[in-house]
Amino acid sequence: MNADFLLPYYTAQSGSSMSMFNTTMGKLQRQLYKGEYDIFKYAPIFESDFIQITKRGEVIDVHNRVRMVTMGIARTSPILPLPDVMLLARPATGCEEYAGHGQATKRKKRKAAKNLELTRLLPLRFVRISVQDHEKQQLRLKFATGRSCYLQLCPALDTRDDLFAYWEKLIYLLRPPMESNSSTCGIPAEDMMWMPVFQEDRRSLGAVNLQGKGDQDQVSIQSLHMVSEVCGATSAAYAGGEGLQNDFNKPTNVLNASIPKTSTELAEEPATGGIKEAAAAGAAAGAATGTVAGALSVAAANSAPGQVSAAIAGAATIGAGGNKGNMALAGTASMAPNSTKVAVAGAAGKSSEHVSSASMSLSREGSVSLAIAGVVLTSRTAAEADMDAAAGPPVSTRQSKSSLSGQHGRERTQASAEGCKEGRERREKDRALGRSSHRRRTGESRHKTRGDKIAQKSSSRSSFSHRANRDDKKEKGCGNPGSSRHRDSHKGVSHTPISKESRTSHKSGRSLWTTSSGSSKGLGRVSSFLRNVRANLTTKVVGTPHGRDVNVMAKMAERSTNVAIAETAEGGQGLETVGSMTPDIMETVTFEAH
């Protein structure tokens, strides 16, 4: 071996290079050995001649000439295990070098021919080499700019037949098919963010930069082919991580947004039903305590129609005690809203005024019917009123509490309770005086018997009025209390017994006034009681507001009037008082007869 071919470090024919390339020095390596590029002066190069073709395999000719390309794979440092540079050269054109000429010398021409001209020098990290067609021995080069070049092997006549197999082996070494993520050289991680990639991999450049900003001491062994795959996977993993985070956060947001919506939807309906049930239950509870009108009107305003009817029925059953009036109220309340209007209108009265007021609104209608029910439930005889007075205030006074303010209701309750109690005591004393006078005065038995008959008629009349109130449930105020003739045109059948009873009561009052002159002490007490009753009635009637409470006051006046009649008939005094209260009685009877 000549000394000219001996290299300081190694040559292509040395052991390492021969085991790697198994070829002799080519013309490109000989040209570089001359020192034009000092870095490649002693570098081993594996090279071959190719012709440039298209993707379809057609030969590219420029000016009817085939374009020849010499491609060499070189290793710039002996410490590198694999080649790191790709060189591209083409045949050089002839050129002439002109030497300087003087005035006394001749012009000299020297032609210096160059075999190859180096056109490209690319690191292998920026080039992807692949086999395009094995049979036609075609390769594909893809550059970092995104452009691709197709080359077909054009070996010389004296080359080996298995030259393309060496290229396949080299491609396999540069990028092993089983381990495609290996690289041909070490790439520092900090250099990767400045490394240009191919056009199809530019979408992953952000992921490369993020990956390259890790530890500065790390060395990446990923090849250029792996950059797109790994970067794509890394970006996908990073996006997937964000997706997972978004997915983890998204259900939380959805949960936070849907819990109010779900809790609102699920809570509103049961809450509404619960409020309605609570309103119905509260209505029944309020009815049990005696505030039937107020509680049931609230239930009618806040509850459904079915629940209103159930609440009214239950309230009437609990609060009334099971009498006939209670049964009528329950039957009316269990009807539909339209039927309830008709029933209430019929119960209130047949005049157009009551019908229009009943059909204006359901809540107002309910209050009117409840006021009438209060009159019916509390309209009893004098004996029942005496029995109830010993137990406590009547139901009508408790209903008047819910209608009026608390202070006025308590005063009226106390006044009515005291009035009933005093009336019972006076009746007992008067009955005792009447019995003693009957024993001492036998000659006056005929007058006494007539007075007893009048008392019985008055009591029967009061019981008849109470029964009429239970059946009709009508409001007060249809006639004029001052004119009996005007009421006669409206009363009809009830005119005759009322007028007879009133005349009989006047006559009996005169007879009792003349026959009971001996009992001055008892009669003085009766007159004081009647004055108290008159004062109570005046204050109550004046202070009563217009509306549903007028019915309760009319009932209370009726009860007090009945008591006054009984005492007057037995005591024999108070003719003027009886005359002034008789129109009230007649008015009440007129209300019941409609």
UniProtKB/Swiss-Prot annotation:
Superkingdom in the source lineage: Eukaryota
Keywords tagged on the record: Golgi apparatus
Ranges of compositional bias, category Basic and acidic residues: 408-433, 442-455, 468-477
Organism: Homo sapiens (Human)
Chief localization: Golgi
InterPro entries in UniProt: GARIL-like_Rab2B-bd
Function of the molecule: RAB2B effector protein required for the compacted Golgi morphology, probably through interaction with small GTPase RAB2B.
Region (Disordered): 387-524
Residue stretches of biased makeup (Polar residues): 396-406, 511-520
Compartment(s) of residence: Golgi apparatus
Name the record gives this protein: Golgi-associated RAB2 interactor protein 4
One Gene Ontology term, aspect cellular component: Golgi apparatus
Organism classification: Eukaryota, Metazoa, Chordata, Craniata, Vertebrata
Family: Belongs to the GARIN family.
Example GO biological process: cell morphogenesis
Complexes and interactors: Interacts (via N-terminus) with RAB2B (in GTP-bound form).
